[in-house]
Amino acid sequence: MIRVASYNIRKAIGTDRARRPERTLEVLNELDADVIALQEADRRFGGRASALPLKLIAEHSDYKPVPFDARPASLGWHGNALLVRKHVEVLEHHLFHLPSLEPRGAVLADVALGGARLRVVGMHLDLSGLWRRRQAQAILAHLKERDGDWPCVLMGDLNEWSTRGGCLRDFAAGHLFAPCGRSFHASRPITQLDQIMVSPDLEILRSGAHASPIARRASDHLPVWADLRIGDARAELPRPHPRLRTRLRHSLERGARRALNLDR
């Protein structure tokens, strides 16, 4: 089993408006995940310093940051960061720009976990619905261009208030959504802005929003999590011919569009 999580930490500023990175780290330790995607992990101005001191992470958790090295003092890229367990091997990592009116990006890492290779993408999408869809399409296009067809997890704050429309339509064409539940506002959750989406070769065992007393105070978002298992078919069956994979993908996309009533 693999546990993944996503958390918009709001630069370690809680609902009490106090910046307490040690409180944020306590929530991360509560999650007990193998991989965590963070949003708003860096300060907004100046050198974009990490909101979580690297020494604090190293000394008081079992996590290490994926070394994107975007800026010397930053934890991630445009506020997006990935944390993995210290024993997890990071095989590759990559960052990329997203189309937007203000600087936005996404981060990607391939990790060795659970005896398999897992691809993880972290994101924080725009407040504008138009730009959210463009960013979702850019992420999906980037994944198609990458080498390797590994089990994939996409996580982040999508800023999507719709339960079925908007950028969710784009991601639904080839991914399954973990039913994590409402994550915003942390003090009284009314909607699920934070999503975990997985490729069909991953089985979602359990999922939820982590609503411990400290998590309700540490940020304006609750972290979301999912327990996953790589499907048996993925492990046992030979990889299909590329043409067959294309046909299967197109079939999945048509089925997802029909399910969401997206055919025009």
Model-assigned labels for residue ranges:
Residues 1-35, 59-60, 64-264:
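Active-site regions of metal-assisted phosphoester/phosphodiester hydrolases
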Residues 12, 39-46:
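Active-site neighborhood of divalent metal-dependent phosphoester/pyrophosphate hydrolases
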Residues 44-47, 74-76:
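Short active-site-adjacent helix-start/loop capping segments
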Residues 50-51, 82:
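Glycine-rich loop at the start of a catalytic domain that most often binds anionic cofactors/ligands
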Residues 53, 57:
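Phosphate-coordination/substrate-recognition cap region in phosphate-metabolizing enzymes
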